[in-house]
A protein has these predicted regions:
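Compact, glycine-rich, soluble single-domain proteins
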Residues: 25-175
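C-terminal motif of bacterial Sec signal peptides marking the signal peptidase cleavage site
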Residues: 20-23
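Bacterial N-terminal signal peptides that target proteins for export
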Residues: 1-13
Length: 175
């Protein structure tokens, strides 16, 4: 049985993910998906058109309930300031790659996020949340780029690589 410190840390991480917003995290399906503004991001000499997640509600919803992610598509999460970030895979029927990016556009961490079993009938939201793996940046980041699972590996993206996009303009728009 985990010690009290481990349980407390897990609870703190779950709270941090809920407060920060994360990938594929809407516990209830949206009534109707809305079209989001997009931005172009250059990743390993390839252009990606990424949906923008500029506010807490959009970051919280993330890529949930998407049956597929286009090969050069995905989402760009923008936060008002750099901080340690964490993601979970809720209601995501497809695997996702996540690149945590600093305020300069440099990759500081990469996570491969696998599909998690959906919330079971009779399973409480709290129990569902508690069983989801947490994918943490480990260091401060201001942006997260999410793409189809395996895509960042195909491109050979690595920690330290530079992404090309207008970090300053997006940073000013984050709420």
């Amino acid at each position: 049985m985990p010690g009290r410190a481990v349980v407390s840390l897990r609870i703190a991480l779950i709270a941090a993910v809920a407060a920060a917003g994360a990938a594929c995290v809407d516990p209830d399906p949206p009534a109707r998906p809305t079209a989001l503004e997009t931005a172009w991001v250059e990743i390993a000499d390839q252009l990606f058109e990424l949906e923008l997640a500029l506010d807490g509600a959009t970051r919280f919803r993330g890529l949930s309930d998407r049956p597929r992610i286009p090969g050069n598509g995905g989402m760009l999460f923008v936060y008002p300031r750099p901080r340690p970030l964490a993601l979970v895979m809720r209601r995501c029927p497809v695997p996702i790659d996540a690149a945590f990016v600093d305020e300069e556009g440099r990759v500081v961490a990469i996570r491969v996020m696998e599909v998690e079993p959906p919330r079971a009938p009779g399973e409480s939201v709290a129990a569902y949340e508690a069983r989801l793996p947490i994918y943490a940046s480990g260091v401060p980041a201001q942006f997260v780029v999410e793409t189809a699972g395996g895509r960042l590996g195909e491109l050979g993206l690595a920690v330290g690589d530079q992404l090309v996009f207008d970090t300053e303009a997006l940073r000013q728009r984050a709420r």
